[in-house]
Amino acid sequence: LPTGERVHRHPDTVIVVTTNSDYAGCREVNQSVISRMDLIYDINTPDLSTMVKRVMNVTGCTDEQETAKMAGVVRDIAERCRQTMISDGSCGMRELKAWVLSTMITKDPYESALSTIIASASADPDNRADLISTCLEKQYVR
């Protein structure tokens, strides 16, 4: 410390660092930090089956078929955002969870999608319209 005092690490200390470096406002992890890490794991998006199991477990939703359909839409939106360089939002596991929870309340996946996965994917009205027509309405017709 600047005072000259030393703080000793407990021998059982484990430090976990997580980051979403591709999000706006986040930076790449500093090289000096990386060089001090013993293990580094990049965690990719889980497959649809894993997404469905996790979301059902967290939300208490029991409709596996509907949750799988919703997970497919989320995957399609994320891919469409990558392809068209829509980068002002997010569409992944947290958004899927929000959509499932909202749908459990509203009983209307389409309406719930508008205020969860679509709203989270982009703030731009044109981008949202594109995601609705190319991804959401392939599975949920209004």
Question: What is each model feature region?
Answer:
Residues 1-142:
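C-terminal regulatory/interaction module of P-loop NTP-utilizing enzymes
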